Amino acid sequence: LREIANERHDIACSIGHSGAVLRAENLALLKYLGLKTRSLEELEFSRFDRLSMVDAQPGAGNVAFDASLRLDVVIDHHPIRPATRSARFTDIRSRYGATSTILYEYLKAARIDIPTPVATAMVYGIRSDTQDLGRESTRADLEAFLDLYPLANARALGRIVQAPLPRNYFSKLRIALDQAKVYGSRIVSFLGRLESPEMIAEAADLLLRAEDVRWTMTLGVVDDWLHVSLRTIDRDRHAGRIARNLAGRRGFGGGHQALAAAQIPLTTGNNSDRQIRIRVKDLTKRFLRATGNPKETGKRLCS
């Protein structure tokens, strides 16, 4: 989006992000692009003439954005949220597998020559969001990938995808595996308290690869929020709807058919370890009820 603003209208742009950037692949991507991004808390929004939100929406639990600010542009591939409708311009394509695909079509329509770093970043975005075009992808995602890949830096892309992982990554992974319980064709794992939510989603992806498993739910606590990730290969049920139900009225939840997330606030009275375990147990029961047999006994994945 900044490429269009710069190339077509000579408009200077600042890029902000919500939360900390901790995932190894994202850090490697920022390093390759040489991007200097700032957290939303550091930005003085009154200095800007226009505000755009990309690959996210206002009102989502993973976006710390001042609700009193009106957005000019929202572009995303997740199902539309009520707060998004107040933006001056919205382009929400929930059938698309990646927001990078939407932005590629903008660049193509504007007849802008896509620089190698931008092409590399967009290829990574499509690969990451669709798991190499194997999940929630469309013909548009495939066409964008095929057009962008020849323009990308394959060696840099490899360094991003295979970015070195910090040792604490494996400590968190061990917890996810140790805590994983199998309920028939479903796996549930509570990772405890974490610094950031990235591992919760990564664990859900990994556990879904277990033999004979069709659903995974992983949970973890970050600050005063209980984060939930859902993954499935079951075409008969919709992960996004289940996530919304799990989140309830006080939380945030939603997503696609095959992957979804929920964020549930923990107030002062219910954020003790005991209260969190009770909440996780309740969410597990509701998840099992929504995805099949709720009375199935859990067995450890790793004996």
Feature locations, PLM:
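Hydrophobic/aromatic beta-strand patches that form the interior of the parallel beta-sheet core
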Residues: 16, 52, 71-75, 90-92, ...
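Short, structured coil segments at secondary-structure junctions
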Residues: 33, 68-70, 85-87
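Short alpha-helices
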Residues: 77-146, 281
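Short, hinge-like loop/turn segments at secondary-structure boundaries
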Residues: 30-34, 92-93, 234-235
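A short, gly/pro- and small-residue-rich
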Residues: 54-56, 64-81
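Hydrophobic helix-and-loop "lid/oligomerization" segment in the mid-to-C-terminal part
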Residues: 1-25, 131-303
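N-terminal small/polar loop signature for handling phosphorylated ligands or for N-terminal nucleophile
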Residues: 1-66
